[in-house]
């Protein structure tokens, strides 16, 4: 599997039916489509992410009444129901990669207020090891993440995720996949 950019990532997440928050890819001027999204998926907060480049600007906690103002800053963006609506339910967040040869990379945090980007900047656990390393047992809920990755055969792919203590997202599961990467 080759994922070259954020558009590829979103398409592959949809194709593989991975759990994610309701999300829509839009472009500058798509005000009516944005308002329709808010109506269909009512929430207190939305996340707005620049999808025109890697590591683009993102706002994790945009109040419902500020969304239209915020989207004017982007040429290509996604709007989604924000994980900020579930802060108190977040158990683990970050990115992981499980390799077919048994190697593991993980950069994760248990901080409930963290986004993936925050977790990678200030991780509680930042490891490059293998699946047999007992240190992985120290990471809360890591087995749940591994089980999801294995079940969906997401090997040799960097997976940005958050794990919750309740079911959320379009498929009502306790894990959300934000992005998957291979070649960017």
In which residue ranges do the predicted regions lie?
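Nucleotide/phosphate-binding sheet-loop regions of phosphoryl- and nucleotidyl-transfer enzymes
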Residues: 1-184
